[in-house]
Amino acid sequence: MCGIIGYTGSENVKDVLLDALELLEYRGYDSAGIAVKDETSHVTNVYKCAGRVSDLRAICDSKKILSTCGIGHTRWATHGGVTDQNAHPHQQGKVTLVHNGIIENYRELIADYDLQEILHSETDSEVAAALLNHYYKGDPKEAIKKTVSKLKGTFALVILFEDQPDVIYSIRNVSPIVATICKEGAMLASDLTALCRFTNEYFVVPEYHILELHKDHVVLTDLNDNVVEPEFLSVDWELNSAGKNGYPFYMEKEIMEQPEAIKNTIKDRIVNGLPDFTSDGVPDSLFTDCDRICVVACGTAMHAGLVAQALVKSIVHVQMDVELASEFMYSNPVIDEKTLVIAVSQSGETIDTLEALKYAKRQGAKCLSVINVKGSSIARESDYVLYTAAGPEIAVASTKAYTTQLSVFYLVVAKMALLRGVYTEEQTKSFIAELERVPEVMQKVLEKRRDIHVIAKKILEAKDLFMIGRGLDYSILLEGSLKLKEVSYIHSEAYASGELKHGPIALITTNTPVVATVTQEKLMSKELSNIKEVKSRGADIVLFIKEALSGDLDTEYQVIKLPDMQDEFMVLPASVALQLLAYYVSSDKGFDVDKPRNLAKVVTVE
């Protein structure tokens, strides 16, 4: 849950590192630091502080830093408080190091190597630096090999040695590292986002391989000193796609990018009006040979799975379960070779989802993943991958990753319905044609953003807010509620409307905001009755309703009419409306929308 960057080349390293760290802040932003090699003396100088990258930039701008080689880190505290001393990089003797992960046996290492007196921080990371310095006798690789043989846990280590000018070393276990070589030099990072300003080509550093970054080349070796050729991947992200492009926050930019992201996600998977995964290498048998499906995911990705579950069960009539990845292994799930396990993750690095996937494979399940980053850990662990085309998503609160995940699931539902004989070819084409309308309909929702902003202003002071809906509406409100609590810090809960009388209605008092969605015609009458019920208890109603269903509504409701689609697809335009609501509440409250307190985007520690 930390951000890492390393660079050696021809550019001013200070600017490269700080710019990259700003792009990596969503991985953690309670402290930041850089270490740079002085151009003449080759001494490694460290600049770090508790606080944001902007605080670090202010410190660095006050110094004369002349260097073209260095490493950087944004921290999300797991061991030790948020202090200058606990910020990375850590220095011990000739070693300067940044680390992502958790070293589980750090206390034992402190005792075994009598390190207590030389440590300056409370972190497990500095223990790794001290151990490296203990073993370093002039051969960096030998010191690295001896050190990692003693470590238990997860780690991505990026290292500078005092007497190795302009060279950066790295090794990892579980925690991700990607790297590249480009005309400006050689780079590595914990996330592809930090590299895409320079190149679209990169490679994933394999576990327990030592990477050397030199100014004009890289060397990758295994622990037996065999040279390994990096396997370069390409990504079609624009080189400037990780910027805000004039928007005040990444979240707003990413909401606005959704029509194009969905178009890019589905366009190459529709052939002659039918779903086609040939280009993904996914065989039809994957969807016909399974008796049941299990989605494993966390947070927003799990909510995408809940929508998929409702669609698969109602349309394809196949049993589908959705499991929290963090609980999956402990629940003794019923998994066998006839189970299709689908892992969903924006980053492809979510540690709980990765571990759940590994467990499912050990039980013999076929594994498909829906992710946004090529070459990520979950992609490499999966039998098959369906990539979304969301592009870089920087805001901690996910928006376009969620809706592109949904668009992939719609394709999967159509494919399964066709292959299993539930849909004829013509019915499948009709379903796909409606999916192709989604970008246009989403754009119409985005054009209503001023109306949604007006409603957002009316709930700024709310301490509690409830969301109610039935069927697919309930599934999307779980995500809408999560978005609101993530970025606005309003206590928000989503309930299935039929459960109101089983407890939640006791919380409704005068002026309690209640957000409802009505997009499913067959459930409309029951849902409107539930809305009237909470209205009679004094609730203030915000209603997002499919335009064709709007008819005669209570004039006291605050209503946003959503452009019409077939009921099964209303999830997508309604999701955008709920994202906008959360965004405007947060921005109007003056919060940092992109970096909600206590949250990091990529969870890489259990």
Question: What spans do the regions from the language model cover?
Answer:
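Generic C-terminus detector
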Residues: T555, M565-E606
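Glycine-rich phosphate-binding loops that contact phosphosugars or nucleotide phosphates
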Residues: T288-R437, R470, T517-P563, L581, ...
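Glycine-rich oxoanion-binding loops at beta->alpha junctions
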Residues: T68-Q85, V271-D284, A308-V344, H491-L507
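Conserved short alpha-helical segments that host acidic/polar catalytic motifs at enzyme active sites
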Residues: M1-K244, P248-F249, E260-K267, V271-D291, ...
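Structural motif
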Residues: C69, V95, R292-C294, L340, ...
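Active-site phosphate/pyrophosphate-binding segments
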Residues: Q258-I262, I266-C294, Y384-P513, S587-E606
